Amino acid sequence: MDRKTLDDTSKFLSYVLRHQPEAIGLTLDGEGWADIDALIAGAARDGRALDRMLLGAVVENNDKKRFALSADGQRIRAVQGHSHAAVAIAYAPAVPPAVLYHGTASRFLDSIRERGLVPGSRHHVHLSARRATALEVGRRYGSPVLLEIDARDMHLAGHLFHQAENGVWLTERVPVRFIREA
């Protein structure tokens, strides 16, 4: 399977499994799961050729582990990053490491300094335990800036953290007082 096919399919899956399942007539359950046969049929109606082998390759080879297959192999979901109102994955609370990181573009700094980190259209703010990963995310949006989050103090102050299956740390918001430009 060539890299371009995997990347294009990953982008398509991110769109329909995180944000717009209706675009192909797909229904997600409350945990974000979609029936694979319905996904394949919806993609075909949209002019996209998907099959179980391609979906398995995307799940297996995605460097950020964005997708998961159910134990029975009949369903697929994005593990985090949802903006769809019907999806509310019940992540277990987790104790974060002392410091987490968030990558952003410099053009967003004024808003972050004023409001902190907010999820925007997503359900959660996404954080990383690795500086390099956070910087990579920031590069997608422009000139990258690395923010250091005092996750220990934030957690002690009562803010909940969760860790998605792919290792991404999630929280509802990050108040300004817990953010430092690294």
Swiss-Prot record:
SUPFAM superfamilies annotated for this entry? ADP-ribosylation
Query: EC number(s) for this protein?
Result: 2.7.1.-
Please list the GO terms describing molecular function: NAD+ poly-ADP-ribosyltransferase activity; tRNA 2'-phosphotransferase activity
- Highest taxon in the source lineage: Bacteria
GO biological process terms on file: tRNA processing; tRNA splicing, via endonucleolytic cleavage and ligation
Against InterPro entries, the record matches this protein to: Ptrans_KptA/Tpt1 (IPR002745), RNA_2'-PTrans_C (IPR042081), RNA_2'-PTrans_KptA (IPR022928), RNA_2'-PTrans_N (IPR042080)
What keywords sit in the KW lines? NAD, Transferase
Name the family the entry cites. Belongs to the KptA/TPT1 family.
Physiological role: Removes the 2'-phosphate from RNA via an intermediate in which the phosphate is ADP-ribosylated by NAD followed by a presumed transesterification to release the RNA and generate ADP-ribose 1''-2''-cyclic phosphate (APPR>P). May function as an ADP-ribosylase.
Name of the molecule in the record: Probable RNA 2'-phosphotransferase
Organism the protein comes from: Pseudomonas aeruginosa (strain ATCC 15692 / DSM 22644 / CIP 104116 / JCM 14847 / LMG 12228 / 1C / PRS 101 / PAO1)
